[in-house]
Amino acid sequence: MNRTESKIKFVGLHAHSVAGSIFDAIGFPNAHMDFCYQNGGEALALTDHGNMNGLPYQVLHCKEMLAAGKKFKPIFGCEAYFIPSVDEWREEYTKAMEDKKRSRAAKKDAQSGATIEDEGSSKKTQGILRRRRHLVLVAQNQTGLNNLFKLVSESYKAENFYRYPRIDYKLLKKYSEGIIASSACLGGVYAGNYWENREDGDEAVMNAMRETTKNMIDVFGDRWYAEIQWNNIKEQHELNQYVIRIAKEFGVKLISTADSHYPNPEAWKDRELYKRLGWLGKSKPSYADEGSELPAGVEEIGYE
């Protein structure tokens, strides 16, 4: 493995473990922490999807490391599932259920030749209802940690949960104190602006990102960070350019993350197999255009 030395210490602020990112990441937090320490790291954030189940592992292993004379700081976080407004989503959901009832009636009519169902519109509505974006949240202090606990708990309540635990701007405003937030990955809030507007051109993407940035700064102030990542996905590099532009425009600080899903480079194949078990073959990776065999090397996967 090639290693680049730098005077600036890299601190991973976006990482996943098997403790909280089931069928997405492998390796318990202690394995991630050990690899980080062995490669000169002094701190690591754990940001599993929608939960903080890995926190006890972080705390216990950090105590073991300190007892062995290894100075290391665990950073507590979560990659939350975000939608702008649960209330607005609920209105959309109610409307969709009414449309679904009408659709069933329309299908019966269609069978008799009376009408034709608008299948495209139905699928579009389902897409909106299921849409959610990633948002990385990291505790800055004890107040932030307490607020993270509250946010995670709130996200699992019936009024917020739909397929996944979700939070919105209203909840973030209530519990934002002491929390650092960043825009996450290709599934993140800035990425959502990119995916939804890129066909309409450069300015459409930027305008959507401006709106997101204003809202996030309103919630977090200078604790809002623009996140870029480095992998082999073409769209990631396109997104990075937009993120850099928006950061410069608003004076938002940039952070670079690994978004790691396995504790060491050699574990990439194990993680790929684990993912496939979770999806039961329903989702074909981008590299698997022919057959279902694993790629020869990690570079063929595209990510991480």
Tell me what each language-model feature is:
Residues 1-304:
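Phosphodiester-processing cores and adjacent nucleic acid-binding clamps
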